[in-house]
Amino acid sequence: MGSDVDWTWKFTPRAADQFDSLDTHIQDRICSKLDEIVESEWRAPGEFLDPLTGGPFSKLRVGQYRLACILDRSESVLEVHRIEHRSGAYTADDD
């Protein structure tokens, strides 16, 4: 059963920049998926995510894109930290 807590989602500045560079139809798809997660009556937000090894992030798949997310349970917020095409989502970067 879903969560009794009202959840919301937000982008970090980096994710917001990545989001802004995407085509509108991809942006719409990502927002729809994030809304579905925080509004679900049947599943808790964490049930939509797959944990990534070696760090605090979980993965959310939206079509060809991967979102690196953290669930802030104390604030009931799904924080999106990165949005990347799946071809480059799992490569190391400088930060």
Map each language-model feature to its residues.
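Enriched for short, Lys/Arg-rich terminal
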Residues: 1-8, 25-28, 62-65, 70-95
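Acidic/histidine-enriched, beta-strand-rich ligand/metal-binding domains
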Residues: 6, 18, 50-53
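Residues that form or immediately flank small-molecule/cofactor binding pockets and catalytic motifs
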Residues: 14, 57, 85
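Surface-exposed, Lys/Arg-rich phosphate-binding patches that contact polyanionic backbones
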Residues: 14-25
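Active-site micro-motifs of SAM-dependent methyltransferase domains
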Residues: 17, 36, 85-88
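A short, surface-exposed loop/turn module that caps and links secondary-structure elements
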Residues: 35-60
